[in-house]
């Protein structure tokens, strides 16, 4: 019996090592490598307090159709607070990791890219993508190759939409409007903290 028990130990350890990693916090210091992969280091107290919300929908709640392709594709109002000290600008990325089918996701679809949002900014008004951004803020290219917000338009099922704001210790400069990948590469080593809001959407059945 002792031999059997000892033999089981490696099996149990192997099983534990194959379990899914614990999800990272949605706030803290994020480092983005050149491949666009983000890793998270120990956050400062101010970074841990950083948060983003929207008056349009609750965290993990359903996004109203007004803000989707079935409505007017209006960008929702976003608000954030308790940004880390030393913030020189904010960047915003909105994407959908469930494309095209949440049961078999194959890619992350990018809906909005904004950068050089002034450090004193604490919110973006509704429809900010169409002339309502603060002075100095610029829009990058989404996956429709447009410099604006493109609302949720999932072909299959209910998708998640991640609204991610990053506090940076610098402004960013690009020769041409950046993609999400361009922005993530430029942010590498400059992220003081980040906050995340998730909304969901599924097209109305006809």
What are these regions (language model features)?
Residues 5-14:
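Bacterial N-terminal signal peptides
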Residues 16-206:
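N-terminus-centered regions that define maturation/targeting leaders and the start
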Residues 4-5, 48:
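Generic detector of short alpha-helix boundary/capping microenvironments
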